[in-house]
């Protein structure tokens, strides 16, 4: 018979996201759209959103790992803003990067000036020895 039917043309390949091609969890397509809509420049290269998504994913993973450690130190299983604050402020580089950022419900780092701490007196021990 005449071979018109389902056999002829090539089957279209399953769509693969740019995030999965780059091995990322963050959405490369969304980052690309936001770069185009944000009036940062007239044109956006193909590699720029991939790179930016990778940087954002790395920073997020770093902060979440440190916040998870802070939560575990406080015997908690859920990360709260306080744990994020402790993680960022105790890390020198993240603190520098996010120095001007305020985290809602984050609180402050516990800090007591050395001058205000009680003095360890040596005279007390010497008096007992005499």
UniProtKB/Swiss-Prot annotation:
Q: Which residues carry this modification: N6-lactoyllysine?
A: 10
- Tell me which residues bear N6-(2-hydroxyisobutyryl)lysine: 6, 10, 37, 75-76, 96, 119
Symmetric dimethylarginine modifications at: 4
Give residues where N6-glutaryllysine occurs. 96, 119-120, 126
Under InterPro entries, the record lists: Histone-fold, Histone_H2A, Histone_H2A/H2B/H3, Histone_H2A_C, Histone_H2A_CS
- Modification sites for Phosphothreonine: 121
Top-level lineage group: Eukaryota
Query: In the record, which positions carry Phosphoserine?
Result: 2
Name the SUPFAM superfamilies for this protein.
Histone-fold (SSF47113)
Residues with the Citrulline modification: 4
> What kind of modification does the protein receive after translation?
Deiminated on Arg-4 in granulocytes upon calcium entry. Monoubiquitination of Lys-120 (H2AK119Ub) by RING1, TRIM37 and RNF2/RING2 complex gives a specific tag for epigenetic transcriptional repression and participates in X chromosome inactivation of female mammals. It is involved in the initiation of both imprinted and random X inactivation. Ubiquitinated H2A is enriched in inactive X chromosome chromatin. Ubiquitination of H2A functions downstream of methylation of 'Lys-27' of histone H3 (H3K27me). H2AK119Ub by RNF2/RING2 can also be induced by ultraviolet and may be involved in DNA repair.
Q: Mark the residues carrying the PTM N-acetylserine.
A: 2
Q: Which residues carry this modification: N5-methylglutamine?
A: 105
| Gene Ontology cellular-component annotations | nucleosome; nucleus
Can you locate the Glycyl lysine isopeptide (Lys-Gly) (interchain with G-Cter in ubiquitin) cross-link? 14, 16, 120
Q: Which GO terms describe its molecular function?
A: DNA binding; protein heterodimerization activity; structural constituent of chromatin
Q: Which PROSITE patterns match?
A: HISTONE_H2A (PS00046)
Share what the entry says about its subunit structure, partners included. The nucleosome is a histone octamer containing two molecules each of H2A, H2B, H3 and H4 assembled in one H3-H4 heterotetramer and two H2A-H2B heterodimers. The octamer wraps approximately 147 bp of DNA.
The protein's role, per its UniProt record: Core component of nucleosome. Nucleosomes wrap and compact DNA into chromatin, limiting DNA accessibility to the cellular machineries which require DNA as a template. Histones thereby play a central role in transcription regulation, DNA repair, DNA replication and chromosomal stability. DNA accessibility is regulated via a complex set of post-translational modifications of histones, also called histone code, and nucleosome remodeling.
Question: Belongs to which family?
Answer: Belongs to the histone H2A family.
In its UniProt entry, what is this protein called?
Answer: Histone H2A type 1-K
Task: Give the originating organism.
Answer: Mus musculus
């Amino acid at each position: 018979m005449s071979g018109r039917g389902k056999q002829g043309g090539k089957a279209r390949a399953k769509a693969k996201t740019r995030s999965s091609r780059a091995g990322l969890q963050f959405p490369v397509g969304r980052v690309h759209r936001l770069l185009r809509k944000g009036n940062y420049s007239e044109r956006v290269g193909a590699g720029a959103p991939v790179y930016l998504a990778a940087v954002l994913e790395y920073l997020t993973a770093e902060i979440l790992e440190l916040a998870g450690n802070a939560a575990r130190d406080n015997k908690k299983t859920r990360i709260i803003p306080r744990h994020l604050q402790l993680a960022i402020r105790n890390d020198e580089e993240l603190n520098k990067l996010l120095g001007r950022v305020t985290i809602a419900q984050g609180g402050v780092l516990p800090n007591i000036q050395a001058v205000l701490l009680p003095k360890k007196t040596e005279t007390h021990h010497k008096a007992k020895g005499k």
